[in-house]
Amino acid sequence: MARDVANVWWAMFGFSVVVLLVVSALWIYAMLRRPRTHTAEEAKRINRRWIIGGGLILPTVTIIALLAFGIPTGRGMLPLPVEGEQPLRIQVIGHQWWWEVRYPESGVVTANQFILPVDRPVDVEVTSADVIHSFWVPRLGGKLDMVPGRTNTLRVQASQSGIFRGQCSEFCGSQHAHMILHVEALEADAFASWIETRRELQHQPPSGDAGRVFAERCGQCHRVTGVSEGNRAPDLSDLATRPTLGAGVIANDADGLRRWLSDHQSLKHGNAMPRHDDIPEETLGQLADWLETLAP
């Protein structure tokens, strides 16, 4: 679908270049030519010719050409009935400044990553939990606004496996630029395996002080299957498999995880997670070690 959108763009670009060249050539011709004297009848005929050609024929041809390219492309992004395998539903909810991604058919929930199968249409149902966001993965197709209290649907389809970048394309606050979505298209078997491993995830809570801190603070907002049921912040059940933290702010490795826990406000100022200045570094380290185990 992204290829179709690109084709429309290139067609519009090519036509715009032609118009620019024609207008420039006419302007140069008008500047250089010698003025001629026309009778009233000749002047009227010339004006009529420009009105018909430039005011009627050219716009009509242009609009017909754009519609011929644009309507089929736009139709492909609508959630219309299809023959064969039915579209997969994926719900994406925008938050300041992270992505909640749900697979209602399997009950899988993740955050800041959008995994989809290759060669199968996907209906992306988007909405927002706070302000207006916009779902946009350039390599997959068009963009669609995420409006609080309203669900919009965009159909996308990946033609090959790979990793792509998604981005919120509607200004949504101070960290708008740091609202990145990791998108990965998997072959059908790999996608089915990905869903199955997430559906079966069950974790054990951390021990000692780390367990107490997680239960008293983290678990009130974050969900970890088998441990906590918080629903106000990103689901952490498969945190260790994600390439970044904070929706693209920092790499998800041992050092990045510790930096995020101890100083996340300097990394992504204004995010909703409170500071942990009163928690000893040793306890934060234990908590980070446990978070690194959250994977299938």
What do these predicted ranges mean?
Residues 1-118, 199, 296:
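Extracytoplasmic entry segments of secretory-pathway proteins
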Residues 88, 96-102, 110-187:
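Membrane-embedded segments
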Residues 157, 180-189, 223-258:
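Gly/Gly-Pro-rich "capping" loops immediately C-terminal to redox-active cysteine motifs
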Residues 164, 214, 290-291:
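Conserved hydrophobic/aromatic "anchor" residues
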Residues 174, 178, 203, 220, ...:
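Inter-heme linker and motif-flanking segments adjacent to c-type heme-binding CXXCH motifs
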Residues 176-179, 229-239, 260-294:
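Axial heme c-ligation environment in periplasmic c-type cytochrome domains
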Residues 198-209, 248-262:
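Short Fe-S-cluster ligation motifs
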Residues 203-224, 236:
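Sequence/structural segment immediately N-terminal to covalent heme-attachment motifs in c-type
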